From Swiss-Prot:
Residues 901-1018 form the SET domain. CDD domains: ePHD_ATX3_4_5_like (cd15663), PHD_ATX3_4_5_like (cd15495), PHD_TCF19_like (cd15517), PWWP_AtATX3-like (cd20143), SET_SETD1-like (cd10518). Its EC number is 2.1.1.-. A zinc finger (C2HC pre-PHD-type) spans 661-695. Transmembrane segments: none annotated. This is Histone-lysine N-methyltransferase ATX5. GO terms for biological process: DNA-mediated transformation; methylation. It is found in: Nucleus. It comes from Arabidopsis thaliana. Keywords: Chromatin regulator, Metal-binding, Methyltransferase, Nucleus, Repeat, S-adenosyl-L-methionine, Transferase, Zinc, Zinc-finger.
Amino acid sequence: MIIKRKLKTLKRCNSTNEEDDIVRKKRKVNLNGGGSGGDYYYPLNLLGEIGAGIVPGKNGFSVSLCKQVSCSPKVEVVEEEEEEEEIKSTRLVSRPPLVKTSRGRVQVLPSRFNDSVIENWRKDNKSSGEEREEEIEEEACRKEKVKVSSNHSLKIKQQETKFTPRNYKYSSSSALCGEIDDEDKCEEIVRYGNSFEMKKQRYVDDEPRPKKEGVYGPEDFYSGDLVWGKSGRNEPFWPAIVIDPMTQAPELVLRSCIPDAACVMFFGHSGTENERDYAWVRRGMIFPFVDYVERLQEQSELRGCNPRDFQMALEEALLADQGFTEKLMQDIHMAAGNQTFDDSVYRWVEEAAGSSQYLDHVAPSQDMKKYRNPRACVGCGMVLSFKMAQKMKALIPGDQLLCQPCSKLTKPKHVCGICKRIWNHLDSQSWVRCDGCKVWIHSACDQISHKHFKDLGETDYYCPTCRTKFDFELSDSEKPDSKSKLGKNNAPMVLPDKVIVVCSGVEGIYFPSLHLVVCKCGSCGPERKALSEWERHTGSKAKNWRTSVKVKSSKLPLEEWMMKLAEFHANATAAKPPKRPSIKQRKQRLLSFLREKYEPVNVKWTTERCAVCRWVEDWDYNKIIICNRCQIAVHQECYGTRNVRDFTSWVCKACETPEIKRECCLCPVKGGALKPTDVETLWVHVTCAWFQPEVCFASEEKMEPALGILSIPSSNFVKICVICKQIHGSCTQCCKCSTYYHAMCASRAGYRMELHCLEKNGRQITKMVSYCSYHRAPNPDTVLIIQTPSGVFSAKSLVQNKKKSGTRLILANREEIEESAAEDTIPIDPFSSARCRLYKRTVNSKKRTKEEGIPHYTGGLRHHPSAAIQTLNAFRHVAEEPKSFSSFRERLHHLQRTEMERVCFGRSGIHGWGLFARRNIQEGEMVLEYRGEQVRGIIADLREARYRREGKDCYLFKISEEVVVDATEKGNIARLINHSCMPNCYARIMSVGDDESRIVLIAKTTVASCEELTYDYLFDPDEPDEFKVPCLCKSPNCRKFMN
């Protein structure tokens, strides 16, 4: 098809046939390169000088000669004189596309076809010149903010269902370029909406992005446009509508805001009829709906989505494109929480839609703030109805009026802490966050310059409220005194211009400011050399200029001369040390921090592991001792009790005065291993003191008192712990990032904590390091990892290398029993007589269909649960457990007397007989003692061999290398406890004095009544495969073998 360009035809605006106009407009846009599949032309500088068929174009790109004239009085017709000036200024020509042969050669068409347009049926790639032309065209159209009014019926999605103005066109920039090619000035129409749309356009204008072919971004669409979008790479394209996130998105969607992304609501319902899906769609994952409907409506893969749901969503999108949007707008506002929106203001807008005064009145701008409507929202500027304004004033206290979407943003602290302005999606102002109260603040509100942003990233920032609240001027170690008086010679250090130096008899001139030397040997000239290079030039074999190069006047080595010069300058300009606050003032400051209200963190301290290092293991020289009152378990070295010999009546330091409650001043965790400080009435956890660099212990053996509490920076006392979410005590920091948390909270939460032991210059240095949950995954069973020059020590490595205390051995040659068929259950009528019921004898030889534990209760058949029966035994007196015991022997004696009230035996779901709980047992409660005959290790080995020959199961528990408890023939019911890889009990070896130890089983978790009790046997994992004992616990983390 060839179209001559010499004749220009004026096209009249036909108001009757609107559909034909739309089709012709789209066709013209495609011909001019506005569409994705149109033809493109090469400029003259790429094809050479051809003097025929010069067609001028605006901004250096070709336009169609079929000029379009709008009948709207607001659009002026372009004069021919302006076109002639553009012809003179522009010397680019439009050429037909080059034709590529199959061999890759390029053929240039003859010059007689310069005034013709040949439609290319192939889809070739663009050249770089074409991309630059299209970018210039698109950027020019975007910067002009053109909005041409037309008579076409366009569908616009606004905040209310009944408001669908037809006089304002919301179209993409590519469609506008096809209509305003011949216009140099177009009127600017402010779009209706809030500040989100205006700031969005300004954001696009300030930061233009190079656009690729067929790639659309958030700046190409506006609120109400129908699009195709997908939420992920593996998700299908789904019809959606672009919404205004500030007014039409739910609060959860607004909180998960993603920069440079468009907020869309997908068509169709998810789950129920009242649920909608939302997403933030980035560039390249969003396309216009109408242009791509034929291509994307027949997607081959829907990635697990129901084709019926996709078809219903597509039908709803097509109805919305035709103007049926009432139900859609209702769903949008219902999901956004705008149920009480009054549409009277929008009806008034619709009546006055043609007035530009209304648009200037509604759209808020910086120049019109003093003329703000009294019913306009302070955050977005939207004018509220009288009824809505009265309601929002009643809900939100204060003088500022906020709409419902802006009021939602004030809850998650999306508001400036000084000017109280609402955070906007594309706010151009810079924000900083206070490290104390976590409130965002405009940098301009606190007079923070952009030059100091890098410094704020490395230091802590506090808002004016926190600075006034915590009185930071008392902290002398954090803030340098800028007003301190210097000495008389407070001028900067002035180095001498040059110094004569000597090396191996050769003189030279040293320039301290340049750190270079000019040799005076006579052959080098004025060339400046480095000290090491000049040293080699002089023939010195020392290879160390610091000692070989000397100053000629004083005969001092150059390095020593430089050090003396720096020391002299330091003494001359030494500042007068600032006056340090007194101990009384620092104590008052610390006590003021601790008087702030907080919620104490109540935790359950058990004897399973050390309360300081979290290790489970103990050794003969470093045993785990348990406080007789608070039941805190600590290592002797961790708590500083190496000289303690009587473990039966030992109490911790805090329990020596039980009438006074002790609490840690560095964290909100109650209880634990506490130690006194050098400040009276203040106590700290040993773990908290370890991870504060300013705190140390005066005595290494006793680990008390803790010194340096008053030297902790005050900024550490205003940090929010990410674990307990409280401001109390002093927080420590992750070694990889700026995450703050209490040391004890991190230890209880399973954070990775390490102790590094280094040796520098013959001196041992200890460094404590911790990691947040992002840089190291937390583990509830983690322990304090010790790194030394000889290696790394952790609980896992010791488990592999240390031979554990053996417990019970199970006979390995068990016979496999075939599973029997499921027995038929007979329904029982609870109101019938016992003699009328069917009696079915149970066969004990058959295996149960389901491996579950059955506790054995003596007393015959029972039709009621044990808890209900126990409530009827009012005559039975159950002795209450005393709150405290004078010694561990007394506690052990009470445990032996009452063990049958807590446990019983029964058929185990793991193996043979097992141990069960008669009642609920709390975490950390002592269950019973593992009793048996104590023999030497040699005797235990002989008995084990004899038991194997006789085919008996042996029950051996090793207390130490010399003593083993044999409960095979002599013992109590505790020997029936089975092994489990996920146990609910653990064993603790406790000393009762006179070098005698006992084994006590303690509940690891809360155990319910009738639940089987288990614990980990901790067999040696390094045994060969032929001695492996299979595990039958069937727990989720089963190790398959007990050793």
